[in-house]
């Protein structure tokens, strides 16, 4: 049986991690457009 605390931590970290990756990718995408050296 999964501990409620552990389950809460996992369910709390997953959206934060996905949001962090999305923001990082978005910033890198905008930075790539601003400084396009190709």
From Swiss-Prot:
Pfam families: PetG (PF02529)
Matches recorded under InterPro entries: Cyt_6/f_cplx_su5 (IPR003683), Cyt_6/f_cplx_su5_sf (IPR036099)
Gene Ontology process terms (BP): cytochrome complex assembly; photosynthesis
Domain of life from the UniProt record: Bacteria
Membrane topology annotation: Single-pass membrane protein
Subunit structure: The 4 large subunits of the cytochrome b6-f complex are cytochrome b6, subunit IV (17 kDa polypeptide, PetD), cytochrome f and the Rieske protein, while the 4 small subunits are PetG, PetL, PetM and PetN. The complex functions as a dimer.
Functional description taken from the UniProt entry: Component of the cytochrome b6-f complex, which mediates electron transfer between photosystem II (PSII) and photosystem I (PSI), cyclic electron flow around PSI, and state transitions. PetG is required for either the stability or assembly of the cytochrome b6-f complex.
Family: Belongs to the PetG family.
Descriptive protein name: Cytochrome b6-f complex subunit 5
